[in-house]
């Protein structure tokens, strides 16, 4: 086992990364190795898809499936051996299908096949023992014994960034947004990474290409969400329980939430969101359901306590899932899509009757607590509508700085930095927030500036796209670059979606970003120095020191 893709990975003085029987996320060495094999086969699929594209062969089924399968290897998604093996076997079949199509095309065109890299000729063994024996040869850090560690680090930066983009591609696909040019670019990058490149400059350029590609993917996802559910509206959400039977929906998939709301109409079941599903309450086509009653709980790392205390059925639509056996709720949590845990019921298709039956059989909340309302819903359209008023307050001198404070949350104590930072932001400043990092402070009262809330909840992690649109609008109004705005980004990272958003910001030329709580372990000191020099990325220190530096610039 070797895994170093998330923020909680082991970091010893002489060795970084999870490399023992179980990773910090809870996945076993076997699952980790199987995921490495799956990634390698997917790189082979992409090699043949990339080659097929040169002959105008486009296989929509494979294009739509490949990023989805890659998403299954993202942190806290799929822990189920049989499901990962099934994905690997299907990848092998798809690779063969593409290969046969390419061979037929080259024969027809009387052209020879190019010299094939190892990744293109890799064949999945027939037995689990043989697959696991082979796993170290295709590990994500393969060649580390002889290859410069900076090369390995940049390969991983690209691989993990592309994995985050693949997750957003799958979210967009679910909402009907596909783009063959994006799929072609994805396959080209994935294929190239499978050839184990060693050129540092080429790898840095690749990371920027991934960032720009992801910007387009986030635009697709924004379009899918707003076309399907309407533009988010500033909305009040109750974060306290209401008496009655209940279902909790976590993850990111608004499509699943809509299906659950439709199927629970008239059944006297209250539906709650959790984690990154909080923004659902601001979409007109979702908030119209009266039994979507509120948000329960906080960020993913608290679920083993919060889910244990939730007296109803739970649906996990995407990341982040952690061991449900710890809180003894494995018998009432259901996984969806590429999410899986051994022994946990998995919902195929759009029939949630199992979930509904489970909720009806459970006690539900016995009492209604005093409501506590928070404000959300400042997506792209709402931000653009508010922009004239914001600009006017800036010109009057009432708003002097903008902070984007958010990102992925996690369990480390150092993450209290983000709570303290938000609390210490000056009263003449606005705070934009997004992703589950917002739970560090989103229940606090930040007041307003002449009617403009000081805390603006932009949405899910992918709604960084909305924040970028506001920054571009402000830069246009004040005839300056984004980096010349009184705008500071303070981002917490945990997994691969955060990595690709960071790459997107870098690729768009955004500099001076503060990140934490720690630097990605897969980046060497040399690479961190290069990134700091090129993009002025800064590690967080203390809220007081960082605010002093920011506001005195």
Swiss-Prot record:
Q: Which GO terms describe its cellular component?
A: cytoplasm
Q: What is the native source organism of this protein?
A: Photobacterium phosphoreum
**What SUPFAM superfamilies does its record include?**
Prismane protein-like
Enzymatic reactions = A + NH4(+) + H2O = hydroxylamine + AH2 + H(+)
Record EC number: 1.7.99.1
Kindly indicate whether the keyword Nuclease belongs to this entry.
no
Q: How is the cofactor bound?
A: Binds 1 [2Fe-2S] cluster.
Modified positions (Cysteine persulfide) in chain numbering: 408
Residues in the signal sequence: none
Source organism's superkingdom?
A: Bacteria
Q: Name one GO biological process term.
A: response to hydrogen peroxide
Recorded protein name is Hydroxylamine reductase
| Cofactor(s) required for function per UniProt | [2Fe-2S] cluster; hybrid [4Fe-2O-2S] cluster
> What class does this enzyme belong to in the EC scheme?
oxidoreductase
Task: Tell me which residues bind [2Fe-2S] cluster.
Answer: 3, 6, 18, 25
Q: Which family does it belong to?
A: Belongs to the HCP family.
Q: Which UniProt keywords apply?
A: 2Fe-2S, Cytoplasm, Iron, Iron-sulfur, Metal-binding, Oxidoreductase
